[in-house]
Amino acid sequence: MSEPVMWRTPVGRAKKTSRTPMFNSQSPLARTLSLCSVLSILFLAAPAQAQSPAEPGVRYAIESQKAATTLLLDIAHAGKRLVAAGDRGHILYSDDGGASWTQAKVPTRQLLTAVYFADDKHGWAVGHDALILGTTDGGLTWTQQYENREGEVPLLDVWFENAQHGFATGAYGVLLETTDGGENWEDVADRLDNEDGSHLNAIAEIPGSGLFIVGEMGGMFRSADMGETWERVESPYQGSFFGVVGGGEPGVVVAFGLRGNLFRSTDFGDSWQAIELLDDGDAVESGLADGNRLADGRIIVVGHGGTVLSSEDDGQSFKLFSRPDRRSLSGVVGNPDGNLVLVGQSGVRIVSPTGANLPVQQQ
């Protein structure tokens, strides 16, 4: 276990957006908003344990031998290392493809909703109260970079171009940008045509094209200059999108959300095709929470009820596997063995490339 990291004073505060939050971090609505991009409004999170503003010092995440089996909302690669984040400030890392996990020392007990690494050392995690954590040692130790308790707005996703430049998205149209690795964060929500302050659930890079943001009420935004300017995209669907993945060819975008809705574009969002998802002949209606394009080119999308979708043709078609435990899933990466590492309602699990359980001796 690493030594406790030093406390760093949060830099700045986010200005209020046009939709003022009317909830506190303990309410069911707050938990719903923080999970909306990953668990299709499942109300799975335990109450967020916010630190009292009057309490001195730092409340570190409680060490638990069961952390790898509790709610985890996202997982990412830090080079060959895997890093997962979730409930009560838990951040775990694995150096053996997910077979074993070590809990990092983390200066919060807030619910963490997303984690992202720009390289094998520099990473960020975001969560409740606009909390942003940073690491420069591959996830072993973490420091707080930003927080806005007054706003009580959960951040829902984070993406970095490199070790210096990145964005965090969140509820009520929050969009934060840093150009110095997280030392300072600027509210740049006014770059978006989002006057209603719709929730921004996910952000991703579309290789060869730019950045793409998806959110509630069919919200879609794209940037061809790495976030300096943004254009609103005409959406093929007016429900909520929870995730977006770039394909293997320039311009390919796969966006997905409520009730099994999944759409594919080959021209960076100018036009869209609805992708039919079937379960024994019936339309898939599970909420789709997160996705990833693996090193071998497969696109994997996971969601409610143990849904695992896999595509070997850059998102033109998907095969469905419903995990027998029906536990909801919120994140996926591949490991060196070609298997999938899933996170969600029951923590972390290594499964076969299709999503099926591995033989006992391989788990």
Language-model features: where?
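Acidic, Ala/Val/Gly-enriched low-complexity intrinsically disordered segments
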Residues: E3-V5, V11-A14, A30
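Residue-level detector of bioactive/disordered segments in secreted/extracellular proteins
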Residues: T9-R13, S25, V38
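Short, intrinsically disordered, low-complexity terminal segments
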Residues: V11, S27, L42-P47
